[in-house]
Amino acid sequence: MMQLKKRYFALILLLFLWSGCDRGVDPQPDPLQPDVYLLVNARAAHTNGEESINMDAEDFEDRVHSLAMLVFDSNTGEKVAEHFSSSIGSGTSTYVFTVKLKPGQRDFFFVANIPNMQTAMASIVNKSDMNHFMQVFRDLDPIHYHNATNNNGFPMSRMYSNQTVTIGGTITQPLPFKPDGENNVKLQRVVAKLDVNIVEGVENLQKIELCNANVHYRLVPNQSEPIQFYGPVELRRVGATNQWLGYMPEAIVESTKWWGNTGNAENKPINFFRLTTRGGLVYDVPIITHEGAIPGGQYLPFAKGLLADKPSYTVYRNRHYIYRIKTLPDKIEVKYSICDWNIVTNDTYMGYGYNVGVDEQGNVTITNTMQNCDPHVVRLVAKNGAYFGSQPTDTSVEFTELANGASQTFKVNKDAVAVGSAYLEVYYNPDLNATGVVPDKVFIKK
C-alpha cells in the first residue's frame, strides 16, 4: 500500500461528568489497585493539527452526534469500561467526559454516528465481540453518497491497541489520554471525498455521476474487493459554483485489475465518475490513488491503463480525491491530486493551474501549480461588506503571474459578513463586460 499522509477526523473529549453514560465494568476489581480517572481528548483531526467537531455548518463533514467508547484489557480481552452518548448537540464543538479505569494495558475502541449504537453494542462483553462488530459489512446510508446532515453524520471509528494506563488522576484532575503518544484520539470517516471542479466549459455540462461505488463499509479497513455496487450517483453541485461533490466507501481493487481489464464491461470494481455534456458526449474518468507526478504527464492514459505502469484503483477511506477538469469541444483535460480532508482550517480552492487558499486570519494566497500561458488572470471579488486591505472600497484584486510556483497574498477583511454568507468569489479569466458570469469558487464565512 502506498504511503500517504493519514488524514483523520477528530473530536475533543474533555471533562464532562454529567454527559452520556459511562461506567467501569471490570468483573473482578482489584482493591489493591487504585482507580484511574482518564481525560480522553479526541478531536475531528487533520494532519495539520487544527481539529474540530461540529464546526462545518455547510456540508456537516465533521458532524458527530453520537459516540461510543469501549475499553478492553489487552491481555484477557475482558471489557473494563464503556461510554455512550447519543445526543451530542450540533453546537457542541467541545464534547467532554471522563472514564474510570484500573491501571494496566488497555485496548480502546471509538465508534461514532452508527444508528442505534448503544443497543447494537449491548451484547459486546469482550474484545472478540468488539472485533466482530467492527468487521461487519454495513450498507452505507444512500444519503451519504451525496452529503452528511446535521442529524446523520458520516460513520467514523478508531482503535488504539495496547495503551498503557498508569496510576494517577482524580475525578477533578484526570490524567490526559494520549493514544500512541498523540494528544488526540483521531476518528476516521469510513468514506472518501470526491471533489470535481470544472474550470472550463461548465456551460456545456449536463451532469456528473459517480459509478461503481461500494454498497458496503466496515469500521476497520477493508481487505477484500466490493461485491455490490451503488449508483450511478449524481454528484451534488455546491451552490452556483463550478464544484461538484460526492462520497464513496473504501473500495479495494486487486493490482491484477485495471481499466479495461476487470473482466466486465462496467469496469467493476473500479470507481469512476462520468461527465455528460449537453451535446450528449460522455467522458469516463477512473478514480485512482497515486502520489507524485503522473507517468507520461497526462492523467487519462495512465488512469485508463494504457501505459506500462498501472495505477492503484483502490479508494481509501478518509482521503480527499480532487479533480480539475477542462471540457473542450472533443476531449477533456484532467488534473488530479490527493490531499488531507480538512474541514475548518485553511479553505482551499484548486483551480486549473493555480490554488487559492484562505487561512483563519483572512490571508488569501494565490499560487501557480504549473507554468501558465496568457491569458492567466485570477480575479478575487470581496462580497457582502468584505474588502481587501484597509479600505472598504477595495473589493477586487487580480493575480497575473505566469511562472510555476509564483505566489501572492492578499488580506481580506470579512468582519462585517454574516456567518453563512459569501465573502469571497474567485473568477478565472473573467469577461468583465459579460453579465451573469458564475464564479469558479465561492468562499463562505463559517
From Swiss-Prot:
GO cellular component, one term: cell outer membrane
Propeptide positions: 21-43
Record localization: Fimbrium; Cell outer membrane
Residue stretches in coiled coil: none
Keywords in alphabetical order: Cell outer membrane, Fimbrium, Lipoprotein, Membrane, Palmitate, Signal, Virulence
Primary location class: other
Superkingdom of source: Bacteria
KO phenotype (gene knockout): Mildly increased autoaggregation.
Lipidation positions, renumbered (S-diacylglycerol cysteine): C21
Lipid moiety-binding residues (N-palmitoyl cysteine): C21
Signal peptide: 1-20
Family recorded in the similarity comment: Belongs to the bacteroidetes fimbrillin superfamily. FimB/Mfa2 family.
Subunit structure: Component of the fimbrium tip. Minor fimbriae are composed of a structural subunit, most often Mfa1, and the accessory subunits Mfa3, Mfa4 and Mfa5. Fimbrium assembly occurs by linear, head-to-tail oligomerization of fimbrial subunits. This is mediated via insertion of a C-terminal beta-strand from one subunit into a groove in the N-terminal domain of the following subunit. Mfa3 is required for Mfa4 and Mfa5 insertion into the fimbrium.
Comment field (misc): The name (minor fimbrium subunit) does not indicate the abundance of the protein, but is derived from the greater length of the major fimbriae. In strain ATCC 33277 and strain ATCC BAA-1703 / FDC 381, major fimbriae are 300 - 1600 nM in length and about 5 nm in diameter. In contrast, minor fimbriae are only about 80 - 120 nm long. This length difference is observed only in a small number of strains, including strain ATCC 33277 and strain ATCC BAA-1703 / FDC 381, and is due to a loss of function mutation in FimB, a protein that restricts fimbrial length in other strains.
Record function comment: Tip subunit of the minor fimbriae. These filamentous pili are attached to the cell surface; they mediate biofilm formation, adhesion onto host cells and onto other bacteria that are part of the oral microbiome. They play an important role in invasion of periodontal tissues and are recognized as major virulence factors. Fimbrium subunits from different strains have highly divergent sequences, and this correlates with pathogenicity.
Record's protein name: Minor fimbrium tip subunit Mfa3
Organism this protein belongs to: Porphyromonas gingivalis (strain ATCC 33277 / DSM 20709 / CIP 103683 / JCM 12257 / NCTC 11834 / 2561)
